[in-house]
């Protein structure tokens, strides 16, 4: 009995000590953050999972492209931590959208959390990651030094935004990116090795930033190898917070949330990247624009290219790329989708996770249709595979990556798709040839294996050399170097 009471006393003593320690901790005040500094804790990006969507800032030399290019990092925070109430405004593009797409856009004003650009990395593709640097980084101190290991491309050039300007500073990020890209294009031409394309890519659901960058290196590297050097892209890879948890079970419940995020990404910063940076700069410099997405990444890229950005620049914010990095007309974010067809030369949807009816204009559960069936791009190419078990699980819509969708579309001449197939080596056969604005490819012979550390059957079998052959064949046919 004495031992029992002794044990109880020890337990109570331990509990008392623990409570006292917790009380003491509660009294400890955190060090004040100097004005102008934005920390992860302030804006809700401090958990181990959330840090994985800006991991390049911690490992700029290790988590990097194996060729020159840019990584644009988009994250998501509670809106009250990054922008004042009512700061999110829409451009005239909003009025041009279908009711379903307007509903998607409205989430940018109503969701508890908001997507924003947190960083842009410039990778040089050198040994040991030499020279990789931060072009834009919200996590900087008042002296312009990153709070993480990534260093500024130009010493002292990083000036993080005030916390409540984190969202609106996305326009500054895009202006900085455009100026850097313009310098790269001009420099490459002077060196006698001009770029042929601006190439933008977005990966899909449940993809951490480090994995997305590895995937970029695989896909783009294989396409460059397939071209024997004829394909020289100025690359931009955009990463986004596409994962909820390390638990596969928990992630199942994130499907609807993340497909909405993909739509919002296309209607916001990805759309703005195309409209304000990639398309006008490429037109000015004589380059082709190729945009590629996989799964929910294809959902985001199609929204950006086919519907366009609905975000308007805050009043007084200079237009991007006029008179230098910034300048020209004030405010508003005017303009639609680059004046109709021709904005993007080639949009490729690899195993897309969105409804084909967004393109065909037929009934969809969400009422979301692209204006004029995605007439804003010169050429649209979709792939489908019978071996993809991820897109076939959607019961409320015919996703573009599903072979059953391909069969329905290609049996109906009214859809205006030119249909064909890819062989196991990435060769394609389509009729008619380059004149078709829309092409649909049965890639079942090519997209056939379960990729390493992935699910959904062959949904992610896009990282092999043969897929690079397919991409180069599509680029050569629909968006050849000028």
PLM feature spans:
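Preference for short coil/turn "hinge" residues that link or interrupt alpha-helices
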Residues: 15-18, 198, 289
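Bacterial N-terminal signal peptides that target proteins for export
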Residues: 2-13
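Compositionally biased, intrinsically disordered low-complexity segments
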Residues: 4, 17-20, 31
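Residues embedded in well-ordered secondary-structure elements
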Residues: 14, 189, 336, 369-371, ...
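Bacterial N-terminal signal peptides
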Residues: 11-23
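Flexible, membrane-associating and regulatory peripheral segments of lipid-active enzymes
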Residues: 24-254, 278-281, 325-333, 405-412, ...
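Serine-dependent carboxylesterase/thioesterase catalytic core
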Residues: 26-39, 207-401
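Structural motif
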Residues: 17-20, 192, 339, 372
